[in-house]
Amino acid sequence: MQRFEILDKDAMGRICRIETPHGRIETPTILPVINPNIPFIRAEEMKKFGAQAVITNSYIIYRSMREEALEKGVHGILETDMPVMTDSGSYQLMVYGDVEIKNAEIVEFQRHIGSDIIVPLDIPTPPDADYATAESDLRITLEREREAKELLKGAENLLAVPVQGSTHPDLRRFAAGEARKIGGDIYPIGAVVPLMDAYRFRDLARVILEVRSALPVEPIHLFGCGHPMLFAMAVALGCDLFDSAAYALYAKDDRYLTVYGTKKLSELNYFPCKCPVCSNHDPEELRRMEKNERERLIAEHNLYVSFQEIETIKQAIKENSLFELVEKRVRAHPNMLAGWRQVKHYWELLEKADPKMKRKFLYTGIDSLYRPAVRRHVKAIKNVELPEEVLVSTDFGIYANIYLRPVFGPVPAEMLETYPAGHAEIPEEDVVEEEALKAASEALMELMNSHPEKRFKVYVSKVWMKHLQNLPPNGELNVLS
């Protein structure tokens, strides 16, 4: 049985299928956390929000209901037929510093209770740990993962192989490479919740990109990511699965999730949402409710908005408009924008993943300059045949060999109807950002330098002049009246 299949791609995001013993999971998706002792919302109820699978803590089950779990199985105690992923107690290890169980015991326990996706007892090294500590923890984690692989030989359960390494890029990349050698079914990126809590999205993006560099195809799970404002960026960077108890934890503090951030119920006069909760109640009604009822409804909203964002992301992947969606979402917070801009340092990775042909290019701001389509265009035009004298113009109403467009730069006349430059929607040159004009001007000068034997006569409107003052010697600059 093929356990993993990629159906659609855009940027580094994908729509995939993962086959488990209890059915198929289509990604990207979220696995809501279910507390086996006190289920805030029951596992089966999660289906109405869009859940295809859930995650629970096998260590808690082992400590509090071991015999019942061995008798009924994890699906029996959660009363669901959905796929169930079980964590191993690593969270407790991170919070309390110790757990009273060995790796082999918890892996075997997860297998015996019928977990669909098993997680070994990895060591979640926190951000900013010194290199020696992170490396030592990683060695132990890798040994435990190898042990788990041996223990699960011949089993139908899927194995998750967590990738650790703290905030050290080389360790994360090394860990991902070693995890790939071990051979898991899913690769969770661990110990990143402190980065998300502190809004350290630049560091988060680097961690994801380093892991994706060593795992170019495999399914990646971003452990503990449960805020909808992060999903689009994380998917575009290469993540497929998310899990979180955020829907419940935020609700307990009267915090209301949106794709642009978190709102306090006390500050809301209107709900910016039309989910069943928000359609049938207003903020004042919720504030007057008993705490338990209010928490439940806010948690339901938090789940609805989270799964709605997943559907929005999937549709964007289908339409090849994921870049446009991400460029909107990252403006929710300056630190998210800084995180997204880390893709500039991983050009080759992004170019390999992103589809070469799409229906259109919609410019949303200067971050559109970083898309692979722009870089590919600038490379491609260097191979276009040019006459001895090349006429370049910013006026599309007159004849020219090459037209100069913001963002893309030189566009040969024969490419005016082709993707990307010919299918691009870009603001007029007098209102577009200066960076878009500068990038286009640099692309033109790069083309001129690559053809020193050709003569370029360049006719541009005034807005371009300051960016083209230093044309190469084979260029003649003229201003259009």
Curated annotation (Swiss-Prot):
Cofactor(s) named in the record: Zn(2+)
Highest taxon of the lineage: Archaea
The keyword Glycosyltransferase is assigned to this record: yes
A Gene Ontology biological process term: tRNA wobble guanine modification
Transmembrane segments: none
Gene (name only): tgtA
Protein name: tRNA-guanine(15) transglycosylase
EC code(s) of this entry: 2.4.2.48
Swiss-Prot/TrEMBL catalytic activity: guanosine(15) in tRNA + 7-cyano-7-deazaguanine = 7-cyano-7-carbaguanosine(15) in tRNA + guanine
Cofactor note: Binds 1 zinc ion per subunit.
Binding site for substrate: D122, A191
Listed GO CC annotations: cytoplasm
Family: Belongs to the archaeosine tRNA-ribosyltransferase family.
